[in-house]
Amino acid sequence: AAWAENMDVMWLLRGIPCIYYGSEVEFQAGAPCDKGPNGPLANTGRAYYGQNLMGNVSAENFGLFQADGQVKKTLEHPLARHLQALNRIRQAVPALRKGQYSTEGCLSNGGRAWKKRYTSGDVDSYVLVCMNGDATFTGIENGTYKDAVTGDVKTVHDGKLSTSCAGRGNARVYVLGGT
């Protein structure tokens, strides 16, 4: 859950997300980075990862793939699936990639909440994000919001949206206009 939460922050809040190979399967989780010049790398965070990539992958569109061999198991790991979903959501919502971040009017109970907006030309992307707890967003635009994670739809008439998102690593991503 901690890794999923970390990835939520990297993909939904900040600029360009970056992870090291192996993060998507928690490769060598808990292993020391280095045991000195005489320690075997196989027992460290710098162990060889290549065996996790053996097999064939054919990809299309964004995050859709067919795979076989060990790489299929790697890509089907729950954390890898979480990362794939975050990539699809981020790709579909311009505000997550380029938007201005704000916490004004974002009240969270037990988690984090923020909003982002991006406008350019005919693009106007507005998103409300809640992680790991309940959140209430006030002073927001009226309209229909769709959660990119669950598909839940909320219609706002009074500039206020409330949502619940219990548990570490969980997020709600309400997009104005539902795109």
Where are the predicted features?
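Loop/helix patches that line or flank the sugar-binding groove of alpha-linked glycan CAZymes
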Residues: 1-142, 150-151
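Short, ordered coil/turn segments that flank beta-strands lining enzyme active or ligand-binding pockets
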Residues: 149-150, 157
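C-terminal beta-strand-rich structural cap/linker in extracellular carbohydrate-active enzymes
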Residues: 156-179
